[in-house]
Amino acid sequence: MRRLACYASSSRSELHSGRSRASRRDHGLIFYDKIPEGDANPEEVIWASRDAATRLHRLVDRFAGITYLVVDDADEASLAVGAIEELDGLSLATLLDAVAVDPKAARDLTVIAALGVLAPPSFEPRVFDEFSRLLADEEPAIRARTISAIACPSWPEFVPLLEAMASDDPHDEVRSRASVALAAFLQHLSGAT
C-alpha cells in the first residue's frame, strides 16, 4: 500500500460525501466498501477494480485533520497520477517542493500532518530534513504536532531527536509528548506490539 495524496480540510466536504469526481469517473474502479469512523479508525471509502487486484482507499482522518488516498496495486503509478490530478490532491513531491519555496508554509499544522501521512516507509532524506527543522521550531505547538506526524513513518533516525527532546525541550508538554513517542518508537523498532 502506498499513501499517495493529501487534501486540506477545506476539501473534506466534497470528499466526505462519497461523491467525489473519482467516484463519478470509472477508472476501472467500482465502489467496494465504506467503513464508518470509529474510536480506533478514520472513515474509509474503498473502490476496487473489477478483478479486485487494485484498491483505492480514501480516508478522512479527523485526528490528523486531513483526508488522504491510499492505493494498493502492482501498477500504482498510473492510478496515482490520475487520482491526484482529478481530486486536486497533493503528492509528497509537490508538498516538498512547496515547502522548499516557502519554508513558513511547513509550519501549518495540516502540512505537518500531510508530511507524516505521505512520508514513505523507508527513510527519505528530504522528508527527514523537513521534520528535523520542524522539531527544532521555536513554537511548542509546531514541535508537538511534528512529534505526532513522525509516528507515521517511524524511522529509527528519529530516535536521537526524540531522546534529546524528551530530556531537553524547554516546554513541559513537548518533553512529555517526546517521551511517550520515544517509548512507542523503541517498542515499534524492537518488533514488540
Q: Where are the regions a protein language model picked out?
A:
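Short Lys/Arg-enriched alpha/beta "domain-start" segment
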Residues: 1-60
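HEAT-repeat alpha-solenoid elements in large eukaryotic scaffold proteins
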Residues: 101-112, 136
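Short inter-helical turns and helix N-cap capping residues of alpha-solenoid HEAT/ARM repeat scaffolds
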Residues: 103-104, 138-139, 170-175
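Amphipathic alpha-helical interaction elements
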Residues: 151, 166-170
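Surface-facing alpha-helical segments and adjacent helix-coil boundary elements at the starts of domains
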Residues: 37-105
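Structural detector for internal amphipathic alpha-helices that build alpha-solenoid repeat scaffolds
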Residues: 68-86, 109-122, 143-155, 176-189
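Amphipathic alpha-helical scaffolding segments comprising HEAT/armadillo-like alpha-solenoid repeats
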Residues: 89-100, 121-134, 156-167, 190-193
